[in-house]
From Swiss-Prot:
Functions in the biosynthesis of branched-chain amino acids. Catalyzes the dehydration of (2R,3R)-2,3-dihydroxy-3-methylpentanoate (2,3-dihydroxy-3-methylvalerate) into 2-oxo-3-methylpentanoate (2-oxo-3-methylvalerate) and of (2R)-2,3-dihydroxy-3-methylbutanoate (2,3-dihydroxyisovalerate) into 2-oxo-3-methylbutanoate (2-oxoisovalerate), the penultimate precursor to L-isoleucine and L-valine, respectively. Residues 1-27 are annotated as: Disordered. [2Fe-2S] cluster binds at residues 61, 134, 206. Binds 1 [2Fe-2S] cluster per subunit. This cluster acts as a Lewis acid cofactor. It holds the Pfam family ILV_EDD_C. This is Dihydroxy-acid dehydratase. The active site is at residue 486. PROSITE patterns: ILVD_EDD_1, ILVD_EDD_2. Keywords: 2Fe-2S, Amino-acid biosynthesis, Branched-chain amino acid biosynthesis, Iron, Iron-sulfur, Lyase, Magnesium, Metal-binding. Homodimer.
Length: 575
């Protein structure tokens, strides 16, 4: 073809970053590569929008995400965008739970964030739809969006429906607790086998207000996701409508140059915390919100969770503390119902902006979700007549946790416990102790060397806490650790004790028989040792890393304190 016959492509916005790989005769090789994948002139002249997809067959949370990503892709394509789908990793928290492999979970948050950042940076993308399924997908994707500051929309893959067993609804939480019930003689192995076969009927993230659903709900409160997008179940048609909507919105936010830094503020994070404590959300959200704030350079102290929990009541009775799941919330209007209740009571910053360009109050006005009073359901209470006067999250301190520790209150508010401690160096020893039937009412169990650096990776202890709960000790046995707990954990379980044992935190000084005081009302976690006694015990404390090569050794060196979100990005900022 002669020069005069050269085909003219539509003009592209010169301010788009993707012009670096699509415009000018010098980029002919780049365009040739795109054409090999089926992109045409119209595509190459459009905003290039990534679809970050962690689809995988290793967890029901993510097994359907190719279909979700396809719907988002179509939304971009039909709105004059150029969609480019790419993959990243996921770890199944539930399947790795109770094994050495659980150390990979929190590390995967960092790898997801890094990998999405790298692809969008390397390919000069203009915007991104980030998709999440299993627990660490959500914070990893949002961290990447904040770090790149690309116009971004977060899209949740949706939760699993509850199963049915013996005439009642069951979830994975019931199966984990069934393990403890079998060990205690309260359930037969045959009964557990039947429950196992019915608890997880299809695709989607764990159905209660566990970590995945907590972070998905928080994505709405932060402004990262459109209101109402978190609750549709994974296999409902409405989930794919939300995915298409996310793709369409992604084109809009690129065209409007609306980046996370344009709407994320401290008030956004305070809204997220208010929602978390009102619905009884996962303790993991404390860690992840601190990490997101650090990425955004927003000053968010762990004590803020206490301040907001003190003024925000718990109004949703969902698993693990209650019986209902995310689908129940979806059927009455989803997360916006809770947000409206909080906003109407003056407990939200209604003027906080969202990814749509509107404030959260304006979005609520447009959606007009029902009031809790109008719904009259047994799992949502009004702010004036709450389930608990205070929100579900407490931050404890004291001489055992000078930098803080986290507990979620799922039952009785006024918890006080004092007694001798039984110390375990890793999760496995504690699990064996519980499963062999040694645990008794009034026990205090400490599991240490499971922190961000010491594990490394802050394993979740759902196996241990579920075994304790399954034996009937959810409220009368206390457990604390420098590791984490699953969002499905309930009971007297305290995590994120900081500083951790590996770096010489006070938890490293404990010995069997030391008297521990836990007082939730006073936010106290302490031991009957003086500062001098603890320092004497810690003399010569210089533990070797658990791993000397590979990814676990790398992240042992990179992780920061749980009190700051256990971030690894050296550019992340905190006060």
């Amino acid at each position: 073809m002669s020069n005069q016959e050269r085909q003219e492509r539509p003009e592209k916005d010169p301010d788009l970053r993707s012009t670096e790989v699509t415009e000018g005769y010098e980029k002919a090789p780049h365009r040739a590569m795109f054409r090999a994948m089926g992109y045409d002139d119209e595509d190459l002249s459009s905003p290039m929008i990534g679809v970050a997809n962690p689809a995988a067959d290793i967890t029901p949370c993510n097994v359907h995400l190719d279909d979700v990503a396809d719907a988002a892709y179509d939304g971009i394509d039909d709105t004059e965008g150029m969609p480019i789908e790419f993959g990243t990793i996921t770890i199944s928290d539930a399947i790795s739970m109770g094994t050495e492999g659980m150390k990979a979970s929190l590390i995967s948050r960092e790898i997801i964030a890094d990998s999405v950042e790298l692809v969008t940076f390397g390919e000069r993308m203009d915007g991104i739809v980030t998709i999440g399924g299993c627990d660490k997908n959500m914070p990893g994707m949002m961290m990447a969006a904040i770090r790149t500051d690309l116009p971004s929309v977060f899209l949740y893959g949706g939760s699993i429906m509850p199963g049915e067993h013996d005439g009642r609804e069951v979830t994975i939480q019931n199966v984990f607790e069934g393990v403890g019930a079998v060990a205690d003689g309260e359930m037969s192995e045959g009964e557990l086998d039947e429950m196992e076969r019915h608890a997880c009927p299809g695709a989607g993230s764990c159905g209660g207000m566990f970590t995945a659903n907590t972070m998905a709900s928080i994505s709405e409160a932060l402004g990262f996701a459109p209101l109402g997008s978190a609750s549709p179940p994974a296999e409902h048609e409405s989930r794919y409508e939300e995915a298409r909507r996310a793709g369409e919105l992604a084109v809009e936010v690129v065209q409007e140059r609306r980046s996370p830094s344009d709407f994320l503020t401290r008030e956004s994070f305070e809204n997220a915390i208010a929602l978390q404590v009102a619905v009884g959300g996962s303790t993991n959200a404390v860690l992840h919100l601190l990490a997101l704030a650090a990425e955004a350079g927003i000053d968010l102290d762990i004590e803020t969770f206490n301040e907001i929990s003190a003024r925000t009541p718990k109004i949703a009775d969902l698993q693990p503390g209650g019986e209902r799941v995310m689908n129940d919330l979806h059927e009455v209007g989803g997360v916006p119902v809770v947000l409206r209740a909080l906003n109407d009571a003056g407990l939200l910053h209604g003027d906080a902006l969202t990814v749509t360009g509107n404030t959260i109050a304006e979005e609520l006005e447009q959606i007009d979700p029902p009031t809790v009073e109008d719904l009259d359901v047994d799992y949502l209470n009004t702010v004036e007549d709450p389930i608990h006067e205070r929100g579900a999250i407490r931050i404890l301190s004291g001489n055992l946790a000078p930098d803080g520790a986290v507990i979620k209150i799922t039952g009785e508010d006024h918890l006080h416990h004092e007694g001798p401690v039984r110390v375990f160096e890793q999760e496995e020893g504690a699990m064996e102790y519980v499963q062999e039937g040694h645990v008794e009412s009034g026990d205090v169990i400490c599991i240490r060397n499971e922190g961000p650096q010491g594990g490394p990776g802050m394993r979740e202890m759902l196996g241990v806490t579920s075994a304790v709960a399954g034996q009937g000790h959810a409220e009368d046995v206390a457990l604390f650790t420098d590791g984490r707990f699953s969002g499905a954990t309930r009971g007297f379980s305290i995590g994120h004790v900081a500083p951790e044992a590996f770096v010489g935190g006070p938890i490293a000084a404990l010995e069997d028989g030391d008297t521990i005081t836990i007082d939730i009302d006073d936010h106290e976690l302490s031991v009957d040792l003086t500062e001098d006694e603890m320092q004497q015990r810690l003399e010569g404390h210089d533990p070797e890393p658990t791993y000397d090569s590979g990814v676990l050794a790398k992240y042992h060196n990179d992780f920061g304190s749980a009190a700051n979100g256990a971030v690894t990005n050296p550019g992340a900022k905190w006060d």
